[in-house]
Curated annotation (Swiss-Prot):
Zn(2+) binds at residues 908, 910, 919-920. Belongs to the SecA family. The gene is secA. The keyword Membrane applies. It is found in: Cell inner membrane; Cytoplasm. Its cofactor is Zn(2+). InterPro entries: Helicase_ATP-bd, Helicase_C-like, P-loop_NTPase, SEC_C_motif, SecA, SecA_CS, SecA_DEAD, SecA_motor_DEAD. Monomer and homodimer. Part of the essential Sec protein translocation apparatus which comprises SecA, SecYEG and auxiliary proteins SecDF-YajC and YidC. The lineage of its organism: Bacteria, Pseudomonadati, Pseudomonadota, Betaproteobacteria, Burkholderiales. It comes from Cupriavidus pinatubonensis (strain JMP 134 / LMG 1197) (Cupriavidus necator (strain JMP 134)). This is Protein translocase subunit SecA. ATP binds at residues 87, 105-109, 515. It catalyses: ATP + H2O + cellular proteinSide 1 = ADP + phosphate + cellular proteinSide 2. SMART domains: SecA_DEAD, SecA_PP_bind.
Length: 924
């Protein structure tokens, strides 16, 4: 109440910001007549003038009014589009490192040109980030005309581009590309063996289009570059038969022993997206595995040697229970292809980690591809936070404003619309069963079709869109289906969706980024006419003119029918995705309407709000086929959505807290790697490492501040001779001297090592040896960093169990990952020293050959894959398979291997007081 009163008096923060921006808009508008008087050459010349003024110390903020006015004038001349005042406000919001929330159809692409132009003046590069290659290329070509006119270069960064094309794209003033490609290029740049092979410049300024999709929906899973690990194909096939031999338990056992409706061998937790074996299930699984010869008779699944089997069994159970064909994936050309939960698009080439993809392949009977080893990884949170300036724009960000502020430090500013919105959002209708819901949807579509009103139907899966398509075919209602299977025709279908009597079924936000214009998108239709090879130029011109003439009458006709009608067949977990669907109607002040049809069978209602809504329906004694349409029910659903959003935010925040630990280590390793790459001579680095290793060796045998009698000189001589080839008479030196300091002995060792090393360098020349040293250092850093990533994954998977021992898992993860990192640096130091010190080289040619072999072994990895995996429901972060048994990973498993053999009902040896099966026995 007090907050509401304060807002009435002072206005909300959003209103106050808009008020401030409007003052600058007045300045820009006042400059318009001045720039209208300039010739094209004079207007173009303003860019160079701005550059000189900025180089002279003038800030971008002081240049902003003039730069925006110049950009608007250029747009009027080249694009025949004048920025509205609200678009100028949007441009200022983007320049101020904020997120501009602009309604669909308000011209986000044109708005971005203002902030892009201003920031490109610095010459440090501006990245415009989009969700797919099509939008990146479209916007680069479309807006590139404006930037080129103003004397700025534009590049587009697409996947599968050649190296020199990528370098040219990044060296341009403005670079368009996808979030995945920018992130992968960063990782690849930190895997090169020559600084000239890098493509990115330092990260300066990024504007992220559809910022909610990229920084929130896709932020739960990291970008991963991986290579193939050892083959477990046969094991996946054998494990695939086991879920069919196990019974599913209905209901979860509660603390008091109730809750189980039907006992079984495993329980599916839909909320947590996990599968758990019951007590009976463990025993049955052990019997089956023993019969198959995979474990010994009477042996436990939890024996350390069976950890890998446990992992494969759970992967098979999840594949059968949680991942469904045509909903989470499709099968095409002997491959399992993931369906993006948020857009409904096929994600060709992407694979689930943790052995899950292979388990699904075994289930579907397609060829099983090998598991992967992580070579490099980063989350979007940590990648985008490296930019000096970051901004974003979307139609729906306000519901996630807290997360943007908390994680990225980005404030959301809601930009007023140019024209008042006229869309009517009708109340949800909830039915008892799915069949009743779809009958109502078809009735609504039929009603709109008979009146001539276009309809866009939003579904949450390919399966639903195809089921609805079958229903409409039975009703003889003509329609278009837009889902992952048809995305090649996406632009064409969306262009037609606003025409009279058009019925379009779309999975979630397929076609996002393309406007649905009432009467049809005449620009898009004209584009298809332009590329028709069967028409002459004269025919094309005539057809385009005809389309333009027809469009105006169609536009008015559709407006009179009520504009575009949106039908949602299910509520999404996130209110934001629902708002995106609604936002397709009522663009730029056009009329429109929207309604969601739900049933008690829907996952969201079933898991989070089903009991409450069902109780209301029973209390009201609703007859079959009659819906509830009440504010209390809609509020219950929104409350359920808020719960899920909060839960997903916690998951993303937790992922970030864990990844921040790895990110600090990643920065250190990449800095070390770049220092090695860029150093003129790494000899000094190698010398420091060598001295450090020898000092540690010396102190193992001669502790500081000890007497001569306590020194292990014989042991030291042996280690120096066997490990380092140094024959030093240390014992004789001590005997021959009346008294000797330990530091004098150490100096003697370091000097002897230095002389031997320099003798080796002299044989082939300093320059040749420096190249070899660089290759050895890079090889050691890269190979051990990969092992370290696998070790961190292993640590991460089991760290939650520390909670049972009353320890904070995050603190334990930080502590142990730091210990692993210290060990990593130690291993690199020792390996580099040993290889460079003991290498037997006779000629520069041999040395060069050795360097090339090292570099080739690491830079030409087989079957390298680039993944940004998205689990179904986007609920969980990707982790690589625990079966990767690199040296560091095995070290991380030692704790498990060291656990005594314990019965499942015995107290857990960790000291938590729980039974083993409810504590560390839960390890999967």
């Amino acid at each position: 109440m007090i907050t509401g009163l304060l807002k009435k008096v002072f206005g909300s923060r959003n209103e106050r910001l808009i008020k401030q921006y409007r003052r600058t808009v007045e300045q820009i508008n006042a400059l318009e007549p001045k720039f209208e008087q300039l010739s094209d050459d004079q207007l173009r010349g303003m860019t160079e003038t701005f550059r000189q003024r900025h180089a002279g110390g003038e800030s971008l903020e002081s240049l902003l009014p003039e730069a925006f006015a110049v950009c608007r004038e250029a747009s009027k001349r080249i694009m025949k589009m004048r920025h509205f005042d609200v678009q100028l406000i949007g441009g200022m919001v983007l320049n101020d490192n904020k997120i501009a929330e602009m309604r669909t159809g308000e011209g986000k692409t044109l708005t971005a040109t203002l902030a892009v132009y201003l920031n490109a003046i610095t010459g440090k590069g501006v990245h415009v980030v989009t969700v797919n290659d099509y939008l990146a290329q479209r916007d680069a070509e479309w807006m590139g005309r404006l930037y080129n006119y103003l004397g700025l270069s534009v590049g587009v960064n697409l996947s599968q581009m050649a190296h020199d094309q990528k370098q040219a794209a990044y060296n341009a003033d403005i670079t368009y590309g996808t979030n995945n490609e920018f992130g992968f290029d960063y990782l690849r740049d930190n895997m090169v063996y020559d600084p000239s092979q890098r493509v990115q410049r330092p990260l300066n300024y990024a504007i992220v289009d559809e910022v909610d999709s990229i920084l929130i929906d896709e932020a739960r899973t990291p970008l991963i570059i991986s290579g193939q690990a050892e083959n477990h194909t046969d094991l996946y096939q054998r494990m695939n038969g086991i879920p069919r031999l196990l019974e599913r338990q209905i209901g979860e056992e509660k603390a008091d022993g109730t809750g189980v409706e039907k006992p079984g061998d495993y329980y599916v937790d839909e909320k947590g997206h996990q599968v758990y074996l019951t007590e009976a299930g463990h025993e049955k699984a052990e019997e089956i595995l023993a019969q198959q010869g995979l474990i010994g008779e009477g042996e436990s699944l939890y024996a350390p040697q069976n950890i890998t089997l446990m992992h494969h069994l759970y992967a098979a159970l999840r594949a059968h229970s949680l991942f469904h064909r045509d909903q989470h994936y499709v099968v095409q050309n002997d491959e399992v292809v993931i369906v993006d939960e948020f857009t409904g698009r096929l994600m060709t080439g992407r694979r689930w980690s943790d052995g899950l993809h292979q388990a699904v392949e075994a289930k579907e009977g397609v060829s099983i591809q090998q598991e992967n080893q992580t070579l490099a990884t980063i989350t979007f949170q940590n990648y985008f936070r490296m930019y000096t300036k970051l901004a974003g724009m979307t139609g729906t960000a306000d519901t996630e404003a807290y997360e943007f502020q908390e994680i990225y430090g980005l404030e959301v500013v809601v930009i007023p619309t140019n024209r008042a919105a006229q869309r009517k959002d009708l109340q949800d209708q909830i039915y008892k069963t799915s069949k009743e819901r779809y009958d109502a949807v078809v009735r609504d579509i039929r009603d709109c079709y008979d009146r001539g009103q276009p309809v866009l139907v939003g579904t949450t899966s390919i399966e639903t869109s195809e089921y609805l398509s079958d229903l409409l075919n039975k009703e003889k209602l003509p329609h278009q289906v837009l889902n992952a299977k048809q995305h090649e025709r996406e632009a064409e279908i969306v262009a037609q969706a606003g025409r009279p009597k058009m019925i379009t079924i779309a999975t979630n936000m397929a076609g996002r980024g393309t406007d649905i214009v009432l009467g049809g998108n005449v620009e898009k239709q004209a584009g298809f006419v332009e590329i028709d090879p069967n028409l002459s130029d004269a025919d094309k011109a005539a057809r385009i003119q005809q389309l333009k003439d027809e469009w105006q009458s169609l536009h008015e006709q559709v407006k009179s029918f009520g504009g575009l009608h949106i039908v949602g067949t299910e509520r999404h977990e996130s209110r934001r995705i629902d708002n995106q669907l609604r936002g397709r109607a009522g663009r730029q002040g056009d009329p429109g309407s929207s309604r969601f049809y739900l049933s008690l069978d829907d996952q969201l209602l079933r898991i989070f709000a089903g009991d409450r809504v069902r109780a209301i329906m029973e209390r009201l004694k609703m007859p079959e086929g009659e819906p509830i349409e009440a504010g209390i029910v809609t509020r219950s659903i929104e409350s359920a959505q808020r719960k899920v959003e909060g839960r997903n935010f916690d998951i993303r925040k937790q992922l970030l807290q864990y990844d921040d630990v790895a990110n600090d280590q990643r920065k250190e390793i990449y800095k070390l790697r770049n220092d090695v790459l860029e150093a003129n001579d790494v000899g000094e680095m190698v010398k420091n490492l060598r001295e450090s290793v020898l000092i540690e060796l010396f102190r193992e045998h001669v502790a500081a501040d000890t007497m001569e009698e306590q020194w292990d000189i014989a042991g030291l001589e042996t280690r120096l001779r066997e490990d380092w080839g140094l024959e030093l008479p240390l014992a004789k030196t001590i005997e021959g001297a009346q008294s000797i300091e330990d530091e004098a002995l150490l100096d003697m060792i370091l000097k002897a090592a230095e002389e031997r090393y320099e003798g080796k360098v002299a044989m082939v020349g300093r320059e040749s040896f420096a190249g070899f040293e660089r290759s050895v250092m890079l090889q050691s850093i890269d190979s051990h960093w990969r092992e370290h990533l696998a070790a961190l994954d292993h640590l991460r998977q089991g760290i939650h169990l520390r909670g049972y021992a009353q320890k904070d898992p995050k603190q334990e993860y930080k502590r142990e990952s730091f210990e692993l990192f210290a060990r990593l640096l130690d291993v690199i130091k020792n390996e580099v020293t040993r290889v460079t010190f003991n290498v037997q080289i006779q000629s520069p040619e041999e040395l060069e050959q050795a360097s090339e072999q090292i570099e080739e072994g690491l830079s030409h990895l087989e079957n390298v894959q680039y993944k940004h995996d998205e689990f179904a429901e986007g609920r969980e972060p990707v982790e690589d398979a625990p079966s990767l048994r690199t040296g560091a990973a095995v070290a991380a498993e030692m704790a498990v291997a060291g656990m005594p053999k314990v019965g499942r009902n015995d107290p857990c040896p960790c000291g938590s007081g729980k039974k083993f099966k409810q504590c560390h026995g839960k390890l999967s």
